[in-house]
Amino acid sequence: MKKPYRKISDYAIVGGLSALVMVSIVGCKSNADDKPKEQSSLSQSVQKGAFVILEEQKDKSYKVVEEYPSSRTHIVVRDLQGNERVLSNEEIQKLIKEEEAKIDNGTSKLVQPNNGGSNEGSGFGLGSAILGSAAGAILGSYIGNKLFNNPNYQQNAQRTYKSPQAYQRSQNSFSKSAPSASSMGTASKGQSGFFGSSRPTSSPAISSGTRGFNA
């Protein structure tokens, strides 16, 4: 019986609640090892969900610091003091709806020009950070067409990540899980973010919680 390659030590860079969530993900994958069909296609986890850590910045904006494919969608928010909590399904849907309204009226920072290229004073709120991440491509797939062909979104999506290294780790993680670039559209997107026509049209299961922990 094959064992999952991702060990808990792989996630040493994520702390507190995010590490506990990863333990549950690894446990679920261990049980799934007895099902060859499920184990044979890691792309299923990409389609089902993503584990995302959003970190609050000094200007009260948020950045993606880590994200991985997972069987369920988990969005962990880490504040300036290092406290973490998992957003509930209701919170996530509310944030996405609010951001969709901003996209429609052109006030979302995801669709605005990046003047000067400076992050100072132009950070992303929770809603835009979620939609700029892989989780947003899944949870907000029904509004993907409003963003995918927008050149400003294509430039801004990468800016939702804390660093180029964080963005590249995410790209590598999801492209390794995809069976091919043509079927999942992950490896070929480059700086275009994660939205694509191959994404599912309904939201996957979301694991949520509200307790705060210290990182």
Swiss-Prot record:
The membrane topology noted for this protein in its Swiss-Prot or TrEMBL record is:
Lipid-anchor
Could you give one GO CC term from the UniProt record? plasma membrane
Keyword Lipoprotein on this protein?
yes
Biased composition regions of type Polar residues, renumbered to the chain: 158-169, 184-195
Q: Which residues are annotated with the lipid modification S-diacylglycerol cysteine?
A: 28
> Which residues belong to the signal peptide in this entry?
1-27
Record flagged with keyword Membrane: yes
Point to the regions of Low complexity compositional bias. 170-183, 197-208
Q: Which UniProt keywords apply?
A: Cell membrane, Lipoprotein, Membrane, Palmitate, Signal
Subcellular location(s): the record lists:
Cell membrane
Where is it mainly found? membrane
Q: Where is this region: Disordered?
A: 158-215
Residue positions bearing lipid (N-palmitoyl cysteine)? 28
Name the protein family: Belongs to the UPF0323 family.
NCBIfam families, per the entry: PRK04081.1
Output this protein's name.
UPF0323 lipoprotein jhp_0217
